[in-house]
Amino acid sequence: MGFQDQRSKEAFARANGVLPGGVNSPVRAFKSVGREPIFIAKGQGARLWDIDGNSYLDYVLSWGPLILGHAHPVVVGAIKAAAERGTSYGAPTEIETECAEEVIKAFPSMEMVRMVSSGTEATMSALRLARGVTGRNKIIKFEGCYHGHGDSLLIKAGSGALTFGVPTSPGVPSSVASQTIVAQYNDLEGLKEIFKECGEDIAAVILEPVTGNMGVVLPQPGFLAGLRTLTQDYGSLLIFDEVMTGFRVSYGGAQGRYQIDPDLTCLGKVIGGGLPVAAYGGKRKYMEQVAPSGPIYQAGTLSGNPLAMAAGLATLKLLQQEGVYEGLEKKTARLAEGLQSIAQELGFPIWVNSVGAMFSAFFTDQPVIDFKSACSSDVERFGSFFRGMLERGIYLAPSQYEAVFLSAAHTDADIDYTLEQARDVLKSLG
């Protein structure tokens, strides 16, 4: 019968009547890839099915959380069992403590943890904590790194050598933006200049240690270590946003992989097993300043929700099984390297960055090491590639600047099929 999407088109038209842009998160609208979105009916293992009956190999995995694949029976069973006891209590439960203990085992830099419900909550709360314990107001973020939609973080680089931020969204006051300095990822020398200029005013530096939101960009040798030394020298806190990389580039995240301990860490995605969970944590001396043990306020009605904790704990236990990460990394490398090889064979300009169970294929012929080089990608050509792959049953993120994620449910046969389809699509693009 071939690819059909009439029901998805009708569903999108209906959604546009009640949801801004027809979606509840902008990238889902498929605007950057030149088509309307598909509407999902169900997922199982490495596959999705849409409401038109099309089946896809899924490399989005709910934007990263589903490292075991869709509807893993153990995770689903844990959610069902928890739901039968009650969906929410707004009171302490033992499973919150169990989850926190597992996180702390995996991330030794996190001596205490506070559970929240979204990555945005985690980063906003970590920044408030950093400002509270240092008594300083300014923060540094990196261009191209995304940390949720908090006002302090919806900032892009302004003009001038000392790059004070300007808002990327209406509704963000310029007074808030002026407290955020935007640096360039992998540019340690530029960061040193910023610290020389105003280091005594900087509460924290926040970054994705491996970026995932301008596509996957890896830290250059010495960058993270230099950043750790620089923040210590000036008494600023180093915050790793590992919402995406935590439990994905290794069980202990990017900090475990690169052996760099931040002061605070933000987690999300995988730790919820597909349900809304995030966390922030770090050294005890800082976390004890969080209410109610300290004066720095943070709260949430659904924080530590028992269904989400059950899903997260079940996921982490399964990830501890022998060979899980070795298998994930091998499959990811085979897909990433296979795509690179096909592109080279066809004379097609693609640059691949890969780590752990995530990678990006940038439609450019130059190395991608920062935001500027990521932006050299041909987004129109990527859009054509995306559409071709979608119609062949391969569901990729609908943006050049998002990661490809693999799960334990993906098989070698899945990867073979994906590479076959990629070859056909790239050939058709010339």
Curated annotation (Swiss-Prot):
UniProt-listed GO biological process terms: protoporphyrinogen IX biosynthetic process
Record's catalysed reaction(s): (S)-4-amino-5-oxopentanoate = 5-aminolevulinate
Swiss-Prot/TrEMBL cofactor(s): pyridoxal 5'-phosphate
GO annotation, cellular component aspect: cytoplasm
EC number: 5.4.3.8
Transmembrane segments: none
Matches recorded under Gene3D superfamilies: Aspartate Aminotransferase, domain 1 (3.90.1150.10), Type I PLP-dependent aspartate aminotransferase-like (Major domain) (3.40.640.10)
Main location: cytoplasm
Pathway: Porphyrin-containing compound metabolism; protoporphyrin-IX biosynthesis; 5-aminolevulinate from L-glutamyl-tRNA(Glu): step 2/2
Residues the record lists as N6-(pyridoxal phosphate)lysine modifications: K269
Gene Ontology molecular-function annotations: glutamate-1-semialdehyde 2,1-aminomutase activity; pyridoxal phosphate binding; transaminase activity
Family: Belongs to the class-III pyridoxal-phosphate-dependent aminotransferase family. HemL subfamily.
PANTHER family (alphabetical): GLUTAMATE-1-SEMIALDEHYDE 2,1-AMINOMUTASE, GLUTAMATE-1-SEMIALDEHYDE 2,1-AMINOMUTASE 1, CHLOROPLASTIC-RELATED
Quaternary structure, from the entry: Homodimer.
Protein's name according to its UniProt entry: Glutamate-1-semialdehyde 2,1-aminomutase
Gene label: hemL
